[in-house]
């Protein structure tokens, strides 16, 4: 089980630091352990919500559209905490999660507040066919979008076969951070979806390693993302690796932290070779 010394740390923004923004309506936090995920309650950030003591890990969920999405809950019987990814499209203001009672009945609501954040804009020049899609490319994109939505819905307890002793992430590839999370993207003068990960510039063929133990849940070649691998690290914590030149794993393979499993490339919609690294919590890309 995850101990109170566990960390959720990554160069994609999930850094072990004291909470920066405390929930407005949640009860006071239990005594802080040595490390915690950074709590920054803004669109694209992470909320850290105390659930109180319980003999077993509570079941918590958040409403996304018409779906109740399960949440990552860490801690022990002394005090549990829900780690909530906040969508980039989240409106500032009050938000809440639901905690399901063990014996049934009405869920308990835990409220928190989302503060506004303005992300910068980035203008890029790419191949026109990746901006103004042909009917064939549009149909391909829609098929791939639906497939990856199923991948992103993955929620397992121990995908690597054992509980993680630590969630401390390592950098998957050395290199310069060439593009940040949340940038409002403008391709060839046309606004598109915000950037949902971190870009790390590196030469084609540079090995990429797993930041945590996990299981491969998807390997594919996609229109926008190019060569892509998804890893499942448990309880809705997924990582994504895009624009790859080679993918040396298959679905179901189990990786340990530091295992090389793919290589940097320039496939899909890109301006040059790099790794697009995404981190997802509760089906939400986070910084």
Regions found by a protein language model. Give the residues of each.
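Catalytic cores of peptidoglycan-degrading enzymes
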Residues: 170-287
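Non-catalytic extracellular/periplasmic "stalk"
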Residues: 29-176, 180
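Boundary at the C-terminal end of the N-terminal hydrophobic targeting segment
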Residues: 21-26
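N-terminal secretory signal peptides and thylakoid transit peptides that target proteins
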Residues: 1-15
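A generic secondary-structure boundary signal that marks alpha-helix termini
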Residues: 9, 16-20, 186
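Short amphipathic alpha-helical segments with coiled-coil-like heptad repeat character
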Residues: 15-16, 75
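Short, surface-exposed linear segments at secondary-structure transitions and domain or protein termini
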Residues: 7, 117-124, 249-253
């Amino acid at each position: 089980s995850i101990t109170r010394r566990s960390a959720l740390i990554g160069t994609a923004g999930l850094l072990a630091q004291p909470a920066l923004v405390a929930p407005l309506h949640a009860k006071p936090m239990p005594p802080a352990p040595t490390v915690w995920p950074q709590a920054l309650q803004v669109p694209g950030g992470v909320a850290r919500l105390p659930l109180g003591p319980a003999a077993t890990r509570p079941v918590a969920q958040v409403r996304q559209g018409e779906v109740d999405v399960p949440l990552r809950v860490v801690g022990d019987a002394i005090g549990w905490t829900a780690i909530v990814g906040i969508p980039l499209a989240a409106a500032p203001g009050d938000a809440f999660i639901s905690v399901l009672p063990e014996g049934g009945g009405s869920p308990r609501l835990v409220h928190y507040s989302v503060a506004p954040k303005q992300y910068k804009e980035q203008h890029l020049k790419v191949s026109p066919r990746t901006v103004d899609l042909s009917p064939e490319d549009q149909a391909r994109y829609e098929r791939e979008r639906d497939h990856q939505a199923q991948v992103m819905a993955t929620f397992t307890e121990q995908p690597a076969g054992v509980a993680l002793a630590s969630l401390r992430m390592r950098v998957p590839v050395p290199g310069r951070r060439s593009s940040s999370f949340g940038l409002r993207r403008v391709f060839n003068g046309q606004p598109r979806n915000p950037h949902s990960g971190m870009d790390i510039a590196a030469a084609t063929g540079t090995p990429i390693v797993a930041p945590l133990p996990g299981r491969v849940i998807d390997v594919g070649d996609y229109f926008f993302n190019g060569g892509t691998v998804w890893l499942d690290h448990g309880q809705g914590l997924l990582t994504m690796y895009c624009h790859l030149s080679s993918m040396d794993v298959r679905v179901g393979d189990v990786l340990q932290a530091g295992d090389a499993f793919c290589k940097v490339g320039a496939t899909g919609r890109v301006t040059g070779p790099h790794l697009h690294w995404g981190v997802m919590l509760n089906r939400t890309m986070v910084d």
